[in-house]
Curated annotation (Swiss-Prot):
Name of this chain's protein: Tetraacyldisaccharide 4'-kinase
GO molecular function: ATP binding; tetraacyldisaccharide 4'-kinase activity
The keyword Lipid biosynthesis is assigned to this record: yes
Pathway as given in its UniProt record: Glycolipid biosynthesis; lipid IV(A) biosynthesis; lipid IV(A) from (3R)-3-hydroxytetradecanoyl-[acyl-carrier-protein] and UDP-N-acetyl-alpha-D-glucosamine: step 6/6
InterPro entries, A to Z: LpxK (IPR003758), P-loop_NTPase (IPR027417)
EC number, as in UniProt: 2.7.1.130
Taxonomic lineage from the root: Bacteria, Pseudomonadati, Pseudomonadota, Alphaproteobacteria, Rhodospirillales
């Protein structure tokens, strides 16, 4: 789904829908209060957000896993496998599973560390622990009360913040921001803070970890090159901006709904457009796993990684949960 414009800036429509948003936020709070938490035998780091889609949870989770692995700690990812049919608990096998089975995010995470798909998260946590996980990194699930979290990081896009600040359907928030931040241990802000997020973090007494998304090494080859870009992610404009940052010349850009299952017709039409413009067809790593397998080699990818402004700020957070990293 594409976010309506009024999710970014308050207007008459969002105000009209505000009572429904209040009910939604109340339901989230009630479910959390009534939930019976399962506490795994190992620490759980939740990488979540308050708004729907596009905050940057996956790069944050990958960055955390890489730091833990470098310190000799064995992290496992736990995800519900959004967009896939797998109920789990199931360990993701990159040789056997595709996005239709386990979801696109699980395929990206599994390149970095063992990854479990489980609709009922406690079952996935048990499986991960039995298979040697020393830390569980939970992808999303900040509003899920079925599993106890030892460290909760709320990921926020610096330019979007919490949109108009209202709860769905009146705004992009899964719950009122103040309600969510009251449970958070830290806020991760990706990109320049244009929404007063530092002040909000201070008001809630939590640290702010600033970070930015850095284009992968393949970006160096894009300078001056004509490209036709497409993406089906939460905020495709961020991907298009990254291409321009690399010096690419965007002949066209196409936005698809988040998690869009690309058809052969979709990609063949885009390939034809790129050929007609003597341009390179390019997408994101997350989108690539949803392309027809035999067409992937014809589509370039610009990857991104997370770069912390002050990596040392992670140390006290890890110390708090007894992890040396």
């Amino acid at each position: 789904m594409r976010a309506p414009d009024f999710w970014r800036k308050d207007n008459a429509v969002s105000r009209l829908l505000a009572p429904l948003g209040a009910i939604y936020g109340w339901a989230v709070r009630r479910n959390l209060e009534r939930a019976e938490e399962y506490r795994p035998a190992v620490p759980v780091i939740c990488v979540g957000n308050i708004v729907v889609g596009g905050a940057g949870k996956t790069p944050v989770g990958i960055a955390l896993a890489r730091r833990l692995i470098a310190a000799g700690v064995k992290p496992h990812f736990l995800t519900r496998g959004y967009g896939g049919t797998e109920v789990g608990p199931r360990a993701v096998d990159l040789d056997r599973h595709d996005f239709a089975r386990v979801g696109d995010e699980a395929l990206l995470l599994a390149r970095e560390a063992p990854t479990w798909v489980s609709r009922w998260r406690p079952d996935g946590a048990v499986a991960a622990t039995e298979m040697g996980a020393e830390v569980i990194i939970m992808d999303d699930g900040f509003q899920n009360g079925s599993i106890a979290k030892d460290l909760s990081l709320v990921v926020v896009d610096g330019s979007y913040g919490f949109g108009n600040g209202r709860t769905m359907p009146a705004g992009p928030c899964r719950e009122p921001p103040d309600q969510g931040l009251a449970r958070a241990d830290a806020m991760v802000v990706i990109g320049k803070d244009r929404r007063g997020l530092a002040e909000l973090a201070r008001a809630h007494g939590i640290p702010l970890l600033a970070a930015r998304l850095v284009p992968g090494p393949e970006g160096a080859d894009l300078k001056g090159r004509k490209v036709v870009a497409f993406a089906g992610i939460g905020r495709p404009e961020k991907f298009f901006a990254s291409l321009k940052q690399c010096g690419a010349r965007l002949t066209a850009d196409h936005s698809f709904p988040d998690h869009h299952p690309f058809t052969r017709a979709d990609i063949e039409a885009l390939l034809a457009e790129a050929e007609a413009n003597e341009a390179l067809l390019i997408t994101t790593a997350k989108d690539r796993v949803r392309l027809p397998a035999d067409l992937r080699a014809r589509v370039a990818v610009l990857s991104v990684s997370l770069d912390w402004d002050a990596p040392s700020l992670l140390t006290p957070l890890f110390d708090r949960i007894g992890v040396r990293a």
